[in-house]
């Protein structure tokens, strides 16, 4: 009877150890907690397009070459770095370098009750008549309610830069 009691105690000890190990493994395999709000850099990306009035056949066509008087459209998306989802509190500004000076253009959030699928920010710049022909450098900065920031810069490939042509 004494050996049966020892076997039972030994079996219970083994079961407890195996259970503790299984729980420990499950905990170590769970997803890590997302970072606290306010940490990380915002993810900012987008494109430029011709912003003609709605119904115009060339409205929203992607391009990088524009003429004086053309409406350049900037479209951007901002994501929270911890979730990958849209950061609705973000404030965006386009910074253009034109003729040796910087022009700042605030962006606005595009989605409306009638068009909720447009979950991006937009800004329009009418190319002034006095703008020199050539490349116009730009960046877009974003800041959210937590103080996080992010920046979009186009690729450093001359052929893909915002360019003013005759």
PLM regions with names:
Residues 140-142:
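Conserved structural position at the C-terminal beta-strand
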Residues 65-68, 82-90:
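A short beta-turn/strand-edge loop motif at beta-sheet boundaries
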Residues 129-137:
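Short glycine/proline/serine/threonine-rich loop/turn segments at secondary-structure transition edges
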Residues 82, 144-149:
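Short, solvent-exposed loop/turn segments at the edges of extracellular beta-sandwich modules
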Residues 92-93, 100-116:
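Solvent-exposed serine/threonine-rich low-complexity stretches and specific carbohydrate-binding patches
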Residues 148-166:
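Short beta-strand elements
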């Amino acid at each position: 009877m004494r050996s049966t009691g020892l076997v039972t105690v030994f079996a219970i000890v083994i079961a407890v150890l195996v259970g503790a190990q299984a729980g420990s493994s499950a905990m170590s395999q769970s997803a890590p907690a997302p970072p606290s709000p306010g940490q990380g850099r915002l993810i900012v990306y987008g494109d430029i397009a011709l912003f003609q009035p709605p119904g115009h056949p060339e409205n929203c066509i992607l391009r990088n070459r524009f003429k004086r008087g053309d409406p350049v459209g900037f479209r951007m998306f901002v994501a929270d770095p911890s979730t990958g989802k849209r950061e609705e509190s973000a404030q965006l500004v386009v910074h253009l370098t034109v003729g040796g000076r910087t022009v700042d253009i605030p962006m606005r959030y595009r989605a409306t009750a009638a068009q909720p699928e447009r979950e991006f920010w937009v800004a329009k710049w009418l190319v002034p008549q006095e703008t020199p022909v050539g490349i116009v450098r730009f960046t877009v900065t974003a800041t959210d309610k937590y103080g996080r920031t992010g920046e979009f810069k186009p690729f450093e490939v001359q052929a893909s830069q915002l360019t003013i042509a005759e």
